[in-house]
A protein has these predicted regions:
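Extracytoplasmic gate region of multi-pass secondary transporters
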Residues: 10-11, 198-255, 314, 318, ...
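Helix-breaking motifs and short loop linkers at transmembrane-helix boundaries and internal kinks
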Residues: 22, 54, 75-81, 231, ...
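Conserved MFS/SLC helix-loop-helix module at the cytosolic interface between two early adjacent transmembrane helices
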Residues: 41-79
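Structural signature of the two symmetry-related core transmembrane helices
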Residues: 57-71, 271-288
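Cytoplasmic helix-loop-helix junction between adjacent transmembrane helices
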Residues: 85-124
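Glycine-rich segments within core transmembrane alpha-helices of 12-TM secondary carriers
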Residues: 115-136, 248-252, 337-347
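Helix-loop-helix hairpin linking two adjacent transmembrane segments in secondary transporters
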Residues: 120-173
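Juxtamembrane intracellular "pre-TM" segments in multi-pass secondary transporters
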Residues: 173-205, 229
Length: 392
């Protein structure tokens, strides 16, 4: 929850902040690009570290680090200082996902991991739901031009309380890997070569790049699209952003429940995940309609369905990654996250440049919703059948 609060504070106030700091749309895109690139390298670093260091200690450490950077963002004065803060935030925030996936892998069985991962991802949405309400509260009571600064600091302080609560409530030795699953894999020193030779890995490379591109671009640019592209007020855009992340939460939980339900009805675990992913990808494609709708209730309703789809694909993706490796789970998820972020982050810069040149968000928004379909195609072409997997 807290990692998305830190992340969404900026995008929710992006119109106000870019105006006050006199940033172009491309510069705002550069800030998101820098965040994503730092997140990529952080994913790689913490992905390797989580296989060596206890999650019980690593998790609160990275959260304290990104909370401190989030707090410092409330003091930025120009483009360069904002850029620096987002770089450090991206790097340390990346430690969340390798740690979280080790936790869900330890707690849930193979069949229940899609639902467990949906709970994990939905927590991020809860943070994103709360953030616009906090921001609106500050704007309601203060008309000061600097009213955008305290929300960064409040969210940063919340992270400190979470870290202490974690250390107090989680016993030492928690979240060790399941022995029976550890024995099923060889501890080959050539694990990286084996990974590169694995068709399933390359299917997931395409998938993570595609879903990260659509989710992150819409997340970062939605407030600007609503305010600058469709003429909504800042207040309405903030309230809708909360509603949007309610929809993403529903999509995320719904995806996990659907995959688990299909498994109980007799579908294979893999087929259940793939069907769920495909349905969510179809919802994401609704950007092709939303991008060309005028201001009005229909636009907002379609965007809610887009949100449900673009986040609903993630529990399926996380469950696929957990089938690649147990002994090297942190490293594998870290590598995939690195590739997903390093490839998708530059899109923000070019999207911003396009908006500067055309004064329109429409075409870019329409195209980005199609991206998750590429992940589905890659899975169908590259992921081996169940019988082949058993023989590997």
């Amino acid at each position: 929850m807290i990692n998305y609060m830190d992340r969404q504070v900026l995008s929710n106030m992006s119109v106000r902040i870019t105006s006050q700091l006199k940033l172009s749309e491309e510069q705002y895109g550069n800030v998101e690009w820098a965040f994503g690139t730092a997140f990529a390298f952080g994913s790689l670093a913490f992905g390797f570290l989580v296989d060596k260091v206890s999650v019980r200690w690593l998790y609160p450490a990275v959260l304290l680090a990104w909370s401190a950077v989030g707090f410092a963002t409330g003091f930025v004065r120009n483009y360069d200082s904002l850029l620096a803060c987002r770089i450090f935030l991206g790097f340390f925030e990346a430690g969340h996902w390798p740690c979280a996936l080790v936790v869900t892998h330890s707690v849930f069985s193979k069949e229940e991991r899609p639902f467990g991962n949906s709970i994990l991802q939905s927590g991020a949405s809860i943070g994103a739901i709360i953030t616009p309400i906090i921001i609106q509260g500050f704007f309601w009571y203060s008309q000061d031009d600097q009213a955008w600064r305290p929300p960064f600091q409040i969210v940063g302080i919340v992270g400190v309380f979470w870290a202490f609560a974690w250390c107090y409530s989680i016993p030492v030795g928690s979240f060790t890997r399941k022995k029976e699953e550890m024995k099923s894999e060889s501890n080959s020193p050539n694990w990286f070569i084996d990974l590169l030779m694995n068709r399933r890995f390359w299917a997931l490379v395409v998938m993570v790049i595609s879903i990260n591109t659509s989710w992150q671009l819409i997340r970062a640019w939605m407030p600007k699209f609503l305010q600058q592209g469709r003429g909504y007020s800042e207040s309405i855009a903030l309230y809708f952003n909360s509603a949007y992340f309610v929809a993403t939460d529903i999509g995320c939980i719904g995806a996990g429940l659907l995959a688990s339900r299909l498994t109980r009805l007799g579908r294979s675990v893999h087929a259940s995940r793939l069907i769920t992913y495909g349905l969510c990808s179809l919802l994401a494609c609704l950007t092709c309609i939303a991008a060309f709708l005028p201001q009005g209730w229909l636009l907002l309703v379609v965007l809610l369905f887009v949100g449900a789809g673009t986040l609903g694909v993630f529990p399926c993706y996380y469950s696929f990654t957990q089938e690649l490796s147990v002994t090297d789970l942190g490293k594998v998820t870290g590598i995939l996250s690195f590739l997903g972020w390093i490839a998708s982050s530059p899109v923000h810069r070019y999207f911003g440049r396009y908006v500067d040149q055309t004064k329109s968000f429409d075409l870019g928004l329409a195209l980005v919703g199609l991206a998750p379909m590429l992940g589905l195609i890659a899975m169908l072409l590259l992921w081996p059948s169940t019988s082949q997997c058993k023989n590997d």
